[in-house]
């Protein structure tokens, strides 16, 4: 495909394009079955009006500000969403020998996912092994999610969280996609190095 650099506001795309990142026929069948179950899901509820926002710390509050601007823009279009803000800068960091951690953020994300959220949106630094330097979302975190029937769409305005064309990698986002009846139902993510400005343009 072609690379597109977003430098100004554009209309929404006319056609949604995605892929099932299956490496085997068994994985493809598993994902198709998961999509069918999601479409026929009977667990209707308030969770389908819930949007959860996670924003990285540091960088002069850039990621927090980006999330706030996107939420403000959404509110001008509809007031039907409930916004849960899990910004790292709103929580107290714990200092360890290996650096800072945010255990309360890890816990809050876990609770938000398990109680149900339509979208889990992250803005900040990351890679295919974790989101944030403090790993508020990691493989072990995502594997522990027990959210059957309440699968979120995950959006990560971050670096290479989903390098689908690198066979040697094991992206945690794909792992969450492939989990049976838990994890996530869809993922919007980059597969290469990206920058905050373009991330925000797409996320918005």
Task: Place the predicted regions along the sequence by residue.
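Cysteine-dependent hydrolase recognition
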Residues: 1-204
């Amino acid at each position: 495909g072609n690379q597109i650099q977003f430098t100004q506001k554009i209309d929404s795309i006319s056609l949604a394009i995605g892929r099932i990142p299956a490496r085997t026929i068994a994985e493809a069948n598993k994902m198709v079955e998961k999509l069918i179950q999601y479409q026929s899901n009977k667990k209707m509820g308030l969770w389908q009006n819930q949007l959860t926002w996670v924003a990285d710390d540091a960088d002069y509050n850039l990621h927090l500000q980006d999330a706030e601007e996107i939420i403000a823009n959404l509110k001008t279009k509809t007031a039907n969403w409930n916004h849960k803000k899990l910004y790292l800068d709103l929580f107290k960091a714990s200092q360890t020998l290996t650096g800072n951690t945010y255990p309360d953020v890890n816990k809050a994300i876990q609770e938000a996912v398990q109680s149900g959220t339509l979208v889990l949106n992250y803005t900040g630094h990351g890679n295919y092994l974790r989101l944030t330097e403090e790993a508020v979302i990691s493989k072990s975190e995502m594997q522990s999610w027990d959210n059957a029937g309440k699968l979120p769409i995950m959006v990560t305005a971050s670096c290479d969280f989903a390098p689908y064309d690198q066979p040697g990698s094991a992206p945690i986002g794909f792992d969450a996609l492939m989990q049976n009846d838990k994890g996530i139902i869809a993922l919007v993510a980059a597969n290469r190095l990206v920058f905050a400005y373009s991330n925000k343009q797409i996320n918005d």
